[in-house]
Design a protein with these regions (language model features):
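Intracellular juxtamembrane helix-capping segments at the cytosolic ends
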Residues: 133-147, 337-352
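Juxtamembrane intracellular "pre-TM" segments in multi-pass secondary transporters
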Residues: 2-15, 212-239
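A membrane-interface helix-boundary motif in multi-pass transporters
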Residues: 113-114, 175-193, 380-404
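Short amphipathic helix-loop junctions that connect adjacent transmembrane helices
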Residues: 37-53, 255-272
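C-terminal ends and interior cores of transmembrane alpha-helices
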Residues: 90-115, 307-320
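Glycine-rich segments within core transmembrane alpha-helices of 12-TM secondary carriers
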Residues: 65, 152-177, 194-195, 362-376
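Central cavity-lining transmembrane alpha-helices of secondary-active solute carriers
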Residues: 59-74, 276-289, 369
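Helix-to-loop junctions at the C-terminal end of transmembrane segments
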Residues: 68-81, 177, 284-298, 382
Length: 429
């Protein structure tokens, strides 16, 4: 097939809902990552929460964001993608706006009625509901609004836009906070404006994709039943728990790294802007690393990615400088690229025959579990090594140790369980 023919297939292979849904996903990711880039700083420096409380709140928020898509896909199927997206964007608009209005006079009553920690946590649970619905809607639209011959390209476009949003979100936060001088609270308000505009885009331009043979509605009760079916698979659950160690290491980027940089390296550092380095590195090197690792077995690639990301924080332990922070994020991203694409391939092979779709729905659970642990762990390590031991850079040895322990457990797991023929660390396929 010629390049011109392939280009023609791409031009005609996607229906309008595909482009609208992915366009809105880009701005939703800008809002999410912009918020995430400044959230720890906002809680610690502006609300004066302790490091441990900051970590606990962020861990809870991240867990809800990444766990709820289990049910979010069910709701999207039942109510339709259009209504679900509109609901999600409105919910996020309200949540981000409330977060940016904590110091407003009209919030005085809520601040008096609740302690700050419970008020903030309650408000954060509102925008946390949004991604749980947006993710399955956009992924489902990509499947239904693209022809079979270009569907893989559709998913590549989807993941690329997610990473572009991950790059632009922290940049947006920095622009609002620094050059415009509007402060952190207005970062949340800009995030609210961003997702509200996507509500309007969905309202006026998105139409329900209705390709036959692709739509399967599952009840909430059935989704919960399926969850228990999956969780009874000991081998699968054990793998998810072990691989959660990657995300315990990874989420320190948003939990403890910004506080470490501003608290112990440079109090004026633009931590939010620097957090764009991870996603930008992914965009730049994804194709190259995919090519280099194409012959490495899926499990070996995942284990290697975990090891690389774990070692990344040792750079900051040995060189606690802004340059060390940047280098650590680049290496962290390289590890993320190495494992991410092969992870879903491996999960599909772990699933029993005929249950690949069901198991893939739970592939993101390590992300949620990792965030839930990463938050409190990062907060504790910051307080202990920073305020008690007065050697804050030593915390990164512990973070790296968690990842290295996870790497060793992955090797042990691979020696005990061989999911499918030739899926061990030392075999091809």
């Amino acid at each position: 097939m010629s390049f011109g023919q392939r280009l023609a297939e791409i031009r005609t292979g996607f229906d309008r809902p595909f482009w609208v849904a992915n366009f809105t996903e880009l701005f939703e990711r800008v809002a999410y990552y912009g918020t995430s880039a400044v959230l720890a700083i906002f809680l610690s420096e502006q609300l004066h929460f302790s490091k441990e409380l900051t970590g606990w709140i962020m861990g809870t928020f991240g867990f809800v964001v990444w766990f709820l898509p289990v049910l979010g896909g069910t709701l999207a199927d039942r109510f339709g993608f259009r209504r679900s997206l509109m609901f999600a964007y409105l919910v996020m608009t309200v949540g981000y706006f409330l977060l940016g209005s904590l110091s407003a006079p009209w919030m005085e009553g809520a601040r008096r009625a609740l302690t700050d920690r419970w008020l903030v946590l309650g408000i954060l649970m509102v925008p946390a509901l949004g991604p749980a619905v947006v993710k399955p809607c956009v992924a489902g639209t990509t499947a239904r609004a693209s022809r079979e011959n270009v569907r893989s390209i559709g998913y590549s476009i989807y993941y690329t836009l997610v990473n572009i949003g991950g790059t632009l979100g922290p940049v947006m936060a920095w622009l609002v906070r620094k050059p415009l001088g509007l402060g952190i609270e207005n970062v949340f308000r800009v995030a609210a404006l961003s997702v509200f505009l996507m509500f309007l885009v969905t309202l006026f331009f998105f139409r329900e994709p209705n390709h036959p043979g692709e739509h399967q509605v599952t009840s909430v009760a059935a989704a919960l039943k399926n969850m228990f079916v999956v969780l009874r698979n000991f081998r699968f659950v054990l793998f998810l728990l072990i691989f959660s160690s990657f995300y315990i290491v990874f989420w320190q980027e948003f939990v403890s790294a910004p506080l470490f940089l501003r608290g112990y390296v440079d109090p004026n550092a633009n931590a939010d802007l620097l957090l764009s380095i991870d996603a930008f590195t992914v965009i730049c090197f994804q194709i190259l690393i995919a090519y280099v690792t194409r012959r490495i077995p899926a499990f070996a690639a995942m284990t290697l990615g975990l090891l690389i990301s774990s070692l990344s924080w040792l750079i900051l332990a040995l060189h606690p400088t802004t340059a060390g922070f940047i280098a650590a994020l680049v290496v962290l991203a390289l590890g993320e690229i190495t494992q991410s694409a092969r992870y879903y391939e491996y999960v599909s092979r772990l699933a029993p025959p005929g249950q690949q779709g069901l198991y893939m729905g739970y592939a993101f659970l390590p992300i949620a579990i990792g965030y839930f642990i990463a938050g409190p762990l990062g907060g504790y390590l910051l307080r202990y090594f920073g305020d008690v031991v007065h050697q804050p850079q030593r915390m990164w040895w512990v973070v790296s140790g968690v990842g290295i322990a996870g790497t060793l457990l992955m090797v042990a797991y691979d020696r005990v369980f061989k999911p499918g023929q030739g899926q061990g660390l030392g075999t091809g396929g």
